[in-house]
Amino acid sequence: MGTASSGIAIARSLPLRGDGVRRGIPVVAALRGLGYALLVPFIFFICFTFLRPSPYDFFAIPAMALWFCLGIRLHRGAVVFVALLLLYHLGLLLALLPYFEEPRPVEWSYQSAYLMVTAIFFAMFFADDTRRRLELVFKAYVASSLFAACAGIASYFELFGEGLLFRMDGRAAGVFEDPNVLGSFLIPAALYLVHNLVGGRSRVPVLAVAALAVIAAGIFLSFSRGSWAATVIATVTMVWLMHRTSASARLRRRIVALAFVIAAATAIALVAALGDGDIAERFEDRAQVTKEYDQGVTGRFGNQIRGIPMLIERPNGLGPLRWRLTFGLEPHNSYIGGFANGGWLGGFSFLALVLATGFVGFRLCLTPSPFQRQAQIAWPGLFIFLLQALQIDVDHWRHVFLLFGMVWGLEAARLDWLGRLRRSPTLPARNPDNNPAAAGASLARRGADPAAAAAVGA
């Protein structure tokens, strides 16, 4: 009786979480409902990049403003993330100063700052009520990806004629202006569906398989070499993380078996698609490791080699969007772009952000916590984009900033969870997130590493 009473007293003394939670107040409950109602189209319209302004902006600004008013807060686990983002954008601002009279660099810098705000918002938003919010956002992202994939497929086969949807050089683009962005955008949704199928969490597996087939077709018809490779690497990384952290031999066998089934089905679908002459010809052309525009002194890689000595000599870089004026092309490398657009401060801040996020991401995926499953979807998706950043400019991709916010929101939630466990070890075990022993047992049941689960419950 004494333990239960002390547990209840401790529970009452715990600080309110930042989703905040005056659930008994009808007005606040209604505003929270409105906040979630705005969040879904906010995420869904991420794929609408061909309109200026986009429906994304019409929902993003009121959704973020409302949630800020509802009391989401910056947790200590995301402070490093915010600091590095601010340093990166300070570098952009300093590099912009000589070109403040030019509209395009100024507009680009404003867009960068806007995306930074969305990333910080997501890191704050996902730090509380984490699993429920992430599940909602993943579902909205899958819906967005299905729409984008269907639009891409329609654009490839010109189902609605020319002009309505984007098609570039015979490649599907749909609602995106660039097929490479379409292909990459679809990857996190594919990871979510594969993770649920392999992990046995899909409520209606037939629908999940159908959705995955549509998304895979969208990725394939984008004929983006980077997206093809990224899909394979991200999926293998995620499946390896699932297998590595599973303590159940039965679950490990299931993971391996279903991974082979998905791989075999993909191979069969690829062979069938290549039976079409036009698709086979396009595939053969795009399957080359390098294209003509990549090669030579004035090609993509040649420009990068020529540009690096210039960036070493210029602490303020070239200035936002100045690389294209010097070399006639974008850098097609976000790491070089960080130094070109933001100077040494921007470039090194971006590198530090990537390294810090990599450390946090793999720790989230490999360390048992209530948020491990979501991390094993979000981090491989972001990880592959950070690898793609070596061969394409990802610094204005909305979904990259969403995933940055996810990873750091998960880290903030994990640290907050650990802190609550240490402060309140006698809490009742009804919620495993608030009790070390129950949490360890729960993690073990979910397939976490036994030693790590025991350490959590120690």
What are these regions (language model features)?
Residues 2-76, 88-102, 385, 402:
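N-terminal signal-anchor transmembrane segment
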Residues 3, 43, 135-167, 174-245, ...:
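Alpha-helical transmembrane segments of multi-pass inner-membrane proteins
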Residues 22-34, 68-83, 196-210, 246-255, ...:
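Membrane-interface helix-loop-helix junctions at transmembrane boundaries of multi-pass membrane enzymes
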Residues 34-42, 362-391, 406-411:
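Loop-to-helix entry and N-terminal half of a specific, functionally important transmembrane alpha helix
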Residues 61-67, 377-386, 393-440:
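Transmembrane alpha-helices of multi-pass inner-membrane enzymes
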Residues 81-93, 102-126, 136-145, 149:
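Aromatic-anchored transmembrane helix interface
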Residues 162, 166, 288-345, 361-367:
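Long extracytoplasmic/lumenal interhelical loops at the membrane interface
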Residues 221, 242-291, 305-312, 416, ...:
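A membrane-periplasm/extracellular boundary helix in multi-pass inner-membrane enzymes
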